[in-house]
Amino acid sequence: FHEAALVSVAVSVEQPEENDAINIRGTLNVLQAARAAGVKRVVLASSAAVYGNNPALPKREDMLPEPESPYALGKLAGEHYLKLFSHLYGVETVALRYFNVFGPRQDGKSMYSGVISRFVDDIRAGRAPTIFGDGNQTRDFVFVKDVVQANVLAMRSQEVGNGEVLNVARGQQISLLQLWEALRGITGSKLVPSFREARPGDIRHSLADISKIRKVLCYQPQFDLEYGLGQIVAPG
């Protein structure tokens, strides 16, 4: 399982060479090592960022990628390397395009953290959260346990292994404002968010078509957003 990466779109925009070294060269290094060691299969954590701001929804795996950041471009390059290593060297490969993964133990103070963990960290600190943009941008959040399910299925399935690309999500979208209201409802917070200019490379709307992964891997998301948020904000 190749899960390591520079995962911040904003950092990739500021440091494209670092992104290239980690997300492109790093993936190539993993594939080379797997080939040398006789590893049968490599499963890559790719990203929905490869779709870019194409307004068509939901995002399907056969859509033309339109990367808007070095991060997205690096993930797309990794997918192509997987296909090449499968076809040229016989290494079985699968790329999973993660949408917005969330779950307990994400560090809300980290620059690499997702919006949910940052919101929760703000609530705990009594600090007004910052929303980049108008808050109407949408995301398709998927709980980490469902991502684990997808990875295990991708590693074990005989239906994949030739560089296939599969979306990993719930197939439901929610705006950041709706997300904030959901967290307020769970925690009782009275904080009001502040708004800043949208960041370069950020995606406006995101929603996955998960029919392919359901058909090919029998993937079925088990955990809804309410459950996941409850797991994050629960004491301890």
Stretches found by the model and what they are:
Residues 123-236:
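C-terminal substrate-binding subdomain of Rossmann-fold SDR/epimerase-dehydratase oxidoreductases
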Residues 70, 78, 112, 176, ...:
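Conserved donor sugar-nucleotide recognition element shared by glycan-biosynthetic enzymes
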Residues 34, 86, 122-123, 184:
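A generic structural signal for well-ordered alpha-helical segments
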Residues 10, 56, 120-121, 157-158:
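Short secondary-structure boundary/capping segments
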Residues 108-115:
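Conserved catalytic loops of nucleotide-sugar-dependent glycosyltransferases that act on lipid-linked
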Residues 77, 81, 85, 115, ...:
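Hydrophobic alpha-helix immediately C-terminal to the catalytic Tyr-X-X-X-Lys motif of short-chain
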Residues 1-101, 145, 219, 223:
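N-terminal Rossmann-like NAD(P)+-binding domain of SDR-like oxidoreductases, especially those catalyzing
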Residues 103-105:
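Short beta-strand->alpha-helix junction loop in the catalytic core
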